[in-house]
Each structure stands twice: as C-alpha cells, then as structure tokens.
Amino acid sequence: MEIKRFGRIREVIPLPPLTEIQVESYRRALQADVPPEKRENVGIQAAFRETFPIEEEDKGKGGLVLDFLEYRLGEPPFPQDECREKDLTYQAPLYARLQLIHKDTGLIKEDEVFLGHIPLMTEDGSFIINGADRVIVSQIHRSPGVYFTPDPARPGRYIASIIPLPKRGPWIDLEVEPNGVVSMKVNKRKFPLVLLLRVLGYDQETLARELGAYGELVQGLMDESVFAMRPEEALIRLFTLLRPGDPPKRDKAVAYVYGLIADPRRYDLGEAGRYKAEEKLGIRLSGRTLARFEDGEFKDEVFLPTLRYLFALTAGVPGHEVDDIDHLGNRRIRTVGELMTDQFRVGLARLARGVRERMLMGSEDSLTPAKLVNSRPLEAAIREFFSRSQLSQFKDETNPLSSLRHKRRISALGPGGLTRERAGFDVRDVHRTHYGRICPVETPEGANIGLITSLAAYARVDELGFIRTPYRRVVGGVVTDEVVYMTATEEDRYTIAQANTPLEGNRIAAERVVARRKGEPVIVSPEEVEFMDVSPKQVFSVNTNLIPFLEHDDANRALMGSNMQTQAVPLIRAQAPVVMTGLEERVVRDSLAALYAEEDGEVAKVDGNRIVVRYEDGRLVEYPLRRFYRSNQGTALDQRPRVVVGQRVRKGDLLADGPASENGFLALGQNVLVAIMPFDGYNFEDAIVISEELLKRDFYTSIHIERYEIEARDTKLGPERITRDIPHLSEAALRDLDEEGVVRIGAEVKPGDILVGRTSFKGESEPTPEERLLRSIFGEKARDVKDTSLRVPPGEGGIVVRTVRLRRGDPGVELKPGVREVVRVYVAQKRKLQVGDKLANRHGNKGVVAKILPVEDMPHLPDGTPVDVILNPLGVPSRMNLGQILETHLGLAGYFLGQRYISPIFDGAKEPEIKELLAQAFEVYFGKRKGEGFGVDKREVEVLRRAEKLGLVTPGKPPEEQLKELFLQGKVVLYDGRTGEPIEGPIVVGQMFIMKLYHMVEDKMHARSTGPYSLITQQPLGGKAQFGGQRFGEMEVWALEAYGAAHTLQEMLTLKSDDIEGRNAAYEAIIKGEDVPEPSVPESFRVLVKELQALALDVQTLDEKDNPVDIFEGLASKR
C-alpha cells in the first residue's frame, strides 16, 4: 500500500532511543562492562567508596581496617524465560575484592567476598522480579541546592533554604526575624546564626567587611556577647542549644556539628546540589558539604555567601531573584540507577555496622574479610527496593506502547517525594519549562493528575538528573544543523524560535519572527533569534505524538486519547492506522515487540516458532519467536513471521511482527468505515452501533490468556496429591486429564471443568488399633480423601495452551515452606467484540457498544458499501476534538485511493491538501459508479435539494457536481439499510482508526446464586473475585419501602442475606418442593445486640407481659 507523507519541516536529528532513560541510567550505575580501574565514581562504585574503609571503633585494640579494592558482577544463573517460568529474579551475583589491614602489625589479608545478588535489567529496560516483569518509574523531586523564597507570613522578607539530597542531611532555613536577628532553623530548632558563624571562625571585622553594604541588616548579626567567645566556646554553646539533654563536652560537640554540616558521609548536597549552589551564589565549593573540618577547626563553604544573597535580596539589589520551585531548573529526575544506588548505600551501611560488631567480637588473628562480611542486610535492602518500593511497579504490557510509556513515566510520588493529599495545584500544573521536557498533555485523570507525567519525545536526562531538550543554533538569521541540548535554566538566557518558522534554504524567511524568551512570547527580527526548536514533536510525549491532527483537538480530550492508546488490546488482525503521524515504526522498534535482522543475510528457514537467517559470513543464526506468551495484563504477546525462505534481508529489516504491529508499524486497532449520524437513539450518550460484519471478519477479536495455579502442600493430616485418582467423579469429568492429573494442552474447558486433579485428606478422629493394623497391611487406601481440585471459575474457560509443573528439588525452583509442588495452567480465550465492550479513537472519543446490527440493516453508500460503525455527532462539538473529523475526511480519501498517510502533528495535512485528495477520491468513487452503469439516483437529488436549503451545495449546479461539492466536505448521501430510502441529509463518512480497550464486559459480568458468606456478619461477600452478591443498600431498602413491597423487602434482609436458620430452611423447602417458611432473626441483629452487651448495656427482648424471651434460641445450635 502506498504511503504518502505530509509535512514541511525537515527532521534534523532522529528521536533519541526511547528507553534510554532506563537503560543508560542502570548501565551507568552498575558499570558492569567497564574495567575496575576505569570506573567513574558513580553508582555502586561511589557507594562502595563512601562506605569503605570500615574502621574498628575500639581504638584500644590496635585497629583493624576493612578496605574496598574493586567489585565484579558474575553471570546470571538462569536465563530470562526460565526466571519468568520459575518465579525467580533475573539477577547476577556481586563479588567485591576486600582487604583487611591490621594497623599495628601491617599485616594485610585480601579476599573476594560474595555480597549477594543484584537484579539485572533486560534489553527493553524492565526487570524480572520473582518471575514478574516490573518497571522502576523515575521520580521527580526538588533538586538539592540553595533556594530563596518569599516569607508567606511577612511581605518583603525572604527565607533561604539549604536542601541536601533526600535522607542525606537536615534542611536548613535562614531568615531575618522581626527584631532584626538573623536566625537559623535546623531539625525544628531555631538559634541565632551568628553563633554558627563564630564557630566557623568569623569575627566582627570580617562580617562588617563582607556585609557592610547592607547597613542595618548586618546589625542583626553583631551580638557582642557571641564575638567575645572563642570559636570552641561558641561551639559548646551551639551544642547545648541543639542538644539540650546532652553533657556539653567539646569532642561530643565537634562530632555533632561535624555530622550536621561537614561529614561527607552524613551530609551530601550531591553533584546536582553542588552545581545549583555554585550557580546561584556565584562561588566554587571544595566538596558537597556546607563546611570543612581542617586542623581541628570548622571552615565555612556556603553560609556567608547564602547570607550575602539573602541580604541583597531583602535590600532589593538588582540581579537577585527569588526561586520558582516548580521551574524544571530546580527539579530533577532520580532515575533507576540513582534510586537503586540509594538503597544499595543503605544496605552497605547496615553491612558496615555488622562488620564493626564482628571486629570487636572476634580475635584479630583469625579474622578474614569473608568472616567479617555478612551479605544478608545488603541483599535484603536491594530485594526490598525492587519488590516493595512504591516506584517499583508491575509492568504495564497490555500492548507495546503501554510498556514503552511505563518506562518513560515520571512520578512526583514515592519515598522522599510528594503525597497525593499534600500536593497543591502549583506542583500539578503545566509550567513553561515543561516545553520540550515533560509532556503537557499526558497525565492520569484522577487523584494523580499532574503528579505522574511523561517524558517528552526528544527529552534526555543528563548526569545531574536535569531534563534537557534539543535546539538548533541560529547565527545571524541562518539556522545551522548544530544541535545543543539545554536545561531549563540555560534555555532562559536565549531567544528561541518555533520549529515551524518559515525558512528559505537555511535562512529565516520572515521579517518578524514569533519566538519566546523566558517562556514569554516575543516578536523579534531574525537576527535576534539565537536558537530554534528541532521539531514540533519535541513538545509532546510519544503517546501524544501518535494522535494525528492533535493541533485540532482540545487538550482534555487529547489527554484521554493519549491514555487510552495504552489500554488498547492487541488484536488478531492488527491494522496500522490509515492516518499515521510518523512515530508508529519507532515505537515498535524501541519497544522490542518485533524482531529485526542483526546483520545482512538471507532467510534460510521459517516456521511458526523460529526464523533462521544465514548471514553474509556464512553463520546460521536462529531467532526464536515468542508465541502466545501471557502478558502481565493477560493479553497475548505473539510474534508472527513476516519473511519467506530465500528473502534477502538487510541489517535492521523486519523479520517478525509482534503484538499490535503490522509490517513494523504500531497497530493498536482497526481502520473502519464510520458514519457520524444519530441512529434511532442507539448511539445516545456516546454509545456505539457496529455492524455484525466486523465480528464475521474477526476485526476486533483478541486473545486473552488466564493463568490458574494450584499448590500441593504437606498438611497436618498428610500430604496433598496431584492425581487423576479423584473420588466420586465420572470418567467423563476426567477425560481431559493426563495420567498425572493435569489437563492436556489443547483441551477446551468450560466453567467447573477440572484443570488439575488434587486430593486432600479429610480431618478424622484417632484411628482404632484394628484400623491401624488394616492400614499397615493395605497401605493408605483405607483413609478418606476429599476432592480439592483446581476448577475453571464461573464465567471463564477457553483452550489450554500451556502447563507448567514446579516440584520441590527441581533445579532453581524455590517453593514456599510446606509446598511440595505447584502446577500452573494457561487457558486462552478468543474474544469477539460484544455489546458492552469499550471502543475509542485516538482523539479521546470513547464509548460502549450498544447494538450490533446485521450488515443488511447498516446504512450504506449508493454503491451498496455498508458502513462498519455509527458514531453520534453530538460527541464532537462540545468536546472540541475536531482532529477525528479531519482524520475521517483523510481516511475517506485513503479508502478510495488505497493510500496511507503520514501526517505529523502541527505539521500535517492542511485543509487544501485533504480537499485535493478528496477530489481524486471522488473521481475514483463516481467513476466506479458510472462504470457500473448508474449515475445519480433521483432519490439522491431530493437529498441534494435539502442540502441546497442548508447552504451545503451551490444551487443550480448539476447533481454530479453538487455530489462532488459534498464529497469535498467529507459528506456523502447514505441509504438506510432497513428501508432502502436515503437518509435525510448528507452524512460525514470516512475511515477512522478505532481501538478496543482493555475494559471488556466479559471480565465484569457476574452473577451469584449460592456462594460464600462473611464470617462475622454472615452476609454474602461482595465483588466478582469473591463470587459475591449484589449489595442491597440503604437507598434500595427505601425504594422497596416506598412501594410497600413488604415480603420482598423481608426476604432481601433475611433469607437472601444473613438469616442463617431461615436460609437453610428455605433451601431445604425448595429442594423438597414445599412452601418457604417464615424467616427468623438476621445474624447482623445478633451481632449488634452482642456489641451493645459488650458495652455493658443490658439488652433484652420482652413479651407483652414483660417476661424475657430469647429470640436467638436455636440460632447458637445452628452456628
């Protein structure tokens, strides 16, 4: 099929790798492929360097020191697929070469020590933890550094905040009090800052010289009593203020203040914080702490420059500004590598504590590095992070786009981040610095709106964690191909033009150019422009970039469209959209859903499970295909070959399509012929009418795979057994089980069918001596077993596609205590579209299938072509997502011309271009009608008369030209399939790309007759998962009361709910065919009475003569 490209803007640079934020970050943290001597001091290398050397605390023993030399990662013990099957973590063993040095003797012992396992990242940027694919979401937080913000309580006054990395030191606030004293707040304690300045060695003259320009502000520092002290005395005074309960000793005070501001192990601004502080205050720092401790004295790094800036800001000196905390220059991203390293550092600190304890306990001669180190705390910290952290999430792999989006997510929640309740509007809002860095459209709709966002398409995260976006340099009105990646702070210094600025060659064509400076729009001459956007795509995320004609959609609906694409279910017959945006191929390639040739060669063999390619150098390389693999969401991940034997392939050519891809293009739905018109009220309120033909052609059929699992345990009564030998079952019930009792692959199973046979021992009394004798003679046969087999739950079923058995003792299998074996059965279902399923397009138009019409009842074109889907026109104007109309028009042209289109966002097909294509399409459409011997039908002419009155066509023109005029508006005359008469007015018809979403009615349908009850209240449980009932709540009771339906109401509140005695009697009566007896007292009433009695309230039931009556009589015996 021919693909026609629109767009005038040249691609200057390709998109960066879409999973780079994950893959690069983790690679940098592990540095597994870098030789030890060449490793940078980042990631786990930095964590080792910070934690070691570990010195013995008891200095009297001569002193042991454990030092770190280098680390290495071993090979993972199991491949990825085996980890998924056996519930293992895909990880590599970590070894460190350590040295134990005896200080007094100079003896050195060296050892390689095993430090546990570290999970490895798969090629696509996810992890396999306990058999499940997971993604670590990047976190956005306020960058460490020095910030100046207005004091909310006092206008004209400011607070300086010094912020370290999370959990690496205290926040420190400096402010000028109403009485003029400059105070410092740390760990919720306030004291005069002058005290700390004296500790740091400043005297009156120095402060007067450094800050003399700010006259009266400096007076707040000049406390004579403080300057009269020596720095050591000021230190002890400071210590007593901060730790009032501790004895004021010099060494204690030095240790405390050192830990607070100068110890690199306990206080850390991080590289980003150091950079931000230097940039803000215009200084150079020697390290990442606030002060140094040299020769027994504290030396200042940050406090005086911060104070100088605070005074200048208060005095209104030009060039000093408050900070906007939502500016992306002040927020940074913590990617996987950093998050994991933080946990690794915590684990190492625990490990070091254990080493110090062992140094004190053991005899020095017998100690070796291996004996000192216990790797458990480190391994536990890493495992905790990957399996339980709020940022470690179950991977969304509904389709390739969802998994890609999940890896590009940015969350402000999580440890050290915000909470939903605390986050206000400002944090959630779109900020001007989001331009080209964070997508302004894609975010969830609920409580997390604005807190969870997505990285923009071209954005990259630098080493310091700031998001950079690319710009082309402009010199003297000429746009060069030099591309510069800039942070939000750097960008504020320049004048930047938009990507769609008209160019002649490389020179800016316009005399006045719309540009932006610090986020504000300005109109400038070409010579003033310093940079230019690289592409209109750079503003939005990958998902939003997949919406054609995005510029014609309201942002609220574009948000829904972006989010719903990730919920699209991969279909059996996937189709790439007729109207694409140009990113479809990149998404499939970077998500690793499809298979591509790694070198040039020729296809040697193709079958359903593998493709073999003979490379130019004669090597045969096999590419195994993933067939019907169950995703985390239960959709089928399936790869299908797209090459034939003997075909030549180049490096990077497509070998096999993955789920939701067609010839390497993302294919989340189907192109269907849509009519936008009301239809007898069936498409009221966003409901959708579809043609039965879609079901016949399997257009919206998807495969879903459910996993069922059963364990065989050792119980007190004896071991459970997986077996075919199940008591009281007919041979028919067992026909699909193999001799071991597991269902065979290929069997069709329905609700209630056995998937795995299992027997468990019944509880019984102590056997008599005779029984014991019989048992010893005849074996266990004599004991009673009950059937506890795994059966297909209600409303489910399908074809068994795979079974897995894990037995204790098999290599790599780790089962829970008491479990002997686990059997898993995978059952696949083919689901056709049905009433109640949710459909949506890319523009946020979503609805539920309300009616499936026979194809002969659908409206049809004059040539007899029936439409596939009828959408309600009222769904468009108020939602303001007109992109779908333009897509439909362009789709109409594509339908008759047999073309596909690439229409990039903000640079796509314009109205005249669409009209030109529609004119060509009309020639094909009308030419075909004429060729078949019928021109304009007289009933069509009636519709055209009506169109004239509406001003849609030029009066007096020949009907054929009027039809063409309508066609250029994307409208045609449609006929009602039921009556054969034309529909009154012209109707918009065309191809629209529509997806089936993951919310399928089959997963939500549920009915209960008899089922489980809650233990305390004895009322039926709720929810499909518990096989629960429908709650008959307070308002429903009012409804029955209003109608006076007393018997129905009584039945609802007793027999059908928690009247134990009554429901058992009713069950019996129904079986025997007798009348249902009167209900007795509900159990919840008994619970209420018992609770009141527990509160020492004597609740009694009295008859008319005031004699006590036990209304619960008989209830206790039934319990």
Swiss-Prot record:
It catalyses: RNA(n) + a ribonucleoside 5'-triphosphate = RNA(n+1) + diphosphate. Its EC number is 2.7.7.6. Keywords: DNA-directed RNA polymerase, Nucleotidyltransferase, Transcription, Transferase. SUPFAM superfamilies: beta and beta-prime subunits of DNA dependent RNA-polymerase (SSF64484). The keyword Transmembrane helix does not apply. InterPro entries: DNA-dir_RNA_pol_bsu_ext_1_sf (IPR042107), DNA-dir_RNA_pol_bsu_external_1 (IPR019462), DNA-dir_RNA_pol_su2 (IPR015712), DNA-dir_RNAP_su2_dom (IPR007120), DNA-dir_RNAP_su2_hyb_sf (IPR037033), RNA_pol_bsu_bac (IPR010243), RNA_pol_bsu_CS (IPR007121), RNA_pol_bsu_protrusion (IPR007644). One of its GO terms (cellular component) is DNA-directed RNA polymerase complex. One of its GO terms (biological process) is DNA-templated transcription. One of its GO terms (molecular function) is DNA binding. Disulfide bonds: none annotated. Belongs to the RNA polymerase beta chain family. PANTHER family: DNA-DIRECTED RNA POLYMERASE I SUBUNIT 2 (PTHR20856). DNA-dependent RNA polymerase catalyzes the transcription of DNA into RNA using the four ribonucleoside triphosphates as substrates. The RNAP catalytic core consists of 2 alpha, 1 beta, 1 beta' and 1 omega subunit. When a sigma factor is associated with the core the holoenzyme is formed, which can initiate transcription. This is DNA-directed RNA polymerase subunit beta. It comes from Thermus thermophilus (strain ATCC BAA-163 / DSM 7039 / HB27). The gene is rpoB.
